[in-house]
């Protein structure tokens, strides 16, 4: 049998990624956006440690034909485990898995029997995939197994994964077989909430809570800085028409905490993970640009010149007890936050106890770096044209900067009030550090304070 060169060449062309851009040209725009983000990460150094892997993940997922990431495996907001072994996509809507179950695009198991275009049929094994199995034979097998058929609209038969009527008209064709790619497996770390928790462990291992222990009332500044979260939630829900879950995920951008934003969005609105992650980390990188105008607008020259007294250092015992007590209180009062806060405090305890130096270094360096790579590249992979190039994305980006600005304003305004109540002993500039962008926000407070008064040293107070 000779080789048809024309058909072979045409097959090469039609299976190439370049050809697939003809049917999905918007993916080219996503490739361009990924390149812009790579430029910002490398040249402008905007949060490069995470923005670079996010951008590269976005690039990989939009190089069509690579099959490195499949949104279908995570449809409905959770991992569809039955599909990871390979599944057939029928009519773009329903999935038949390899063990005879049927789930819809939302990942719900509809029945323990196969469902084909509204027909409930029993799982059928075809020894010869080219043979035809009349629908009547399927019904006979149903009866033999003691099952009752339902919603039988017309006679049909199966042939090699395609569904035909009794007259031979095709009802639906079997689509691609879903075989999980590399990023599908790595994305499970996001889906299951593993990566954000491990990053918090690394953050805790490098954080000094001594200033907070020495001056507990500054905890209120962190609470006030969450104003942006709540106000953005209201705007997103009431004005822009997002669902309550989506609005909550968008509002968390105001906390200026990337891992928390990813963790919460993965729980509440996973379809918005790409836009929210990019917005959260972009605004974290822009802290030195966004915060100073707000800080100067809400404070007077006199307030910015206030020199705060140096804090009394926290004792070693206090630093060891602190993460243990916080973990217990948070787990009892707010159990849903226990995974994140528990990992944060575990890392901090490893730092402060003084007997696990090797673990502390691993958490801060090797573990943190590896997880950051996996987190970034998989979050970027969710940013496909269908989810990213929408009006909703522009609304998310706009509300994100509002959330960030309002969070900064909330912290500064409460710091002004605390300054009044303390008789002028608190510099309101430290209020902007109530957002979770550590240590960037604290550095901004330090810089603005020294601009007003070179003798000012606000860094530890802001931390």
Give names to the regions the model predicted.
Residues 19-30, 184-199, 244-252, 281, ...:
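Structural signature of hydrophobic alpha-helical transmembrane segments
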Residues 37, 187-213, 348-350, 368-390:
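Hydrophobic transmembrane alpha-helices of secondary-active transporters
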Residues 279-355:
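Membrane-embedded hairpin module used as a gating/binding unit in multi-pass transport
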């Amino acid at each position: 049998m000779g080789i048809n060169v024309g058909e072979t060449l045409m097959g090469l062309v039609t299976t190439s990624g370049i050809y697939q851009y003809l049917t999905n040209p918007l993916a080219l725009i996503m490739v361009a956006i990924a390149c812009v983000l790579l430029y910002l990460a490398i040249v402008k150094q905007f949060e490069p440690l995470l923005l670079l892997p996010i951008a590269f993940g976005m690039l990989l997922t939009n190089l069509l034909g690579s099959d490195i990431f499949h949104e279908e495996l995570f449809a409905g907001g959770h991992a569809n485990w039955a599909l990871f072994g390979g599944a057939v996509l029928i009519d773009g809507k329903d999935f038949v898995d390899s063990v005879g179950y049927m789930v819809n695009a939302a990942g719900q198991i509809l029945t323990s029997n196969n469902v084909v275009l509204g027909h409930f049929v029993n799982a059928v094994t075809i020894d010869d995939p080219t043979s035809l199995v009349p629908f009547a034979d399927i019904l006979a097998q149903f009866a033999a197994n003691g099952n009752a058929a339902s919603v039988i609209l017309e006679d049909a038969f199966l042939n090699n994964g395609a569904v035909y009527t009794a007259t031979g008209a095709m009802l639906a064709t079997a689509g691609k077989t879903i075989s999980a790619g590399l990023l599908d497996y790595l994305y499970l770390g996001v889906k299951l909430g593993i990566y954000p928790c491990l990053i918090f462990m690394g953050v805790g291992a490098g954080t000094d809570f001594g200033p907070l222990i020495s001056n507990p009332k500054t905890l209120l500044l962190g609470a006030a800085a969450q104003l942006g979260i709540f106000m953005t939630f209201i705007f997103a829900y009431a004005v822009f028409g997002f669902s309550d879950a989506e609005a909550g995920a968008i509002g968390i951008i105001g906390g200026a905490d990337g891992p928390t934003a990813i963790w919460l969005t993965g729980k509440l609105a996973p379809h918005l993970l790409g836009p929210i992650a990019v917005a959260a980390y972009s605004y974290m990188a822009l802290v030195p640009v966004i915060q100073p105008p707000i800080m100067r607008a809400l404070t007077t020259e006199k307030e910015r010149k206030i020199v705060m007294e140096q804090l009394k250092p926290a004792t070693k015992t206090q630093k060891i007890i602190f993460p243990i007590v916080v973990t217990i209180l948070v787990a009892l009062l707010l159990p849903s936050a226990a995974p994140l806060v528990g990992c944060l405090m575990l890392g901090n305890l490893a730092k402060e106890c003084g007997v696990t130096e090797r673990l502390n270094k691993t958490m801060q360096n090797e573990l943190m770096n590896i997880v950051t790579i996996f987190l970034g590249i998989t979050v970027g992979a969710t940013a496909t044209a269908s989810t990213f190039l929408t009006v909703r994305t522009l609304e998310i980006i706009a509300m994100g900067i509002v959330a960030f600005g309002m969070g900064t304003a909330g912290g500064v305004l409460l710091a002004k009030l605390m300054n009044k109540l303390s008789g002028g002993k608190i510099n309101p500039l430290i209020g902007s550090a109530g957002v979770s962008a550590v240590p960037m926000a604290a550095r901004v407070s330090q810089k603005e304070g020294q601009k007003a008064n070179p003798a000012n040293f606000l860094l530890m107070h802001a931390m």
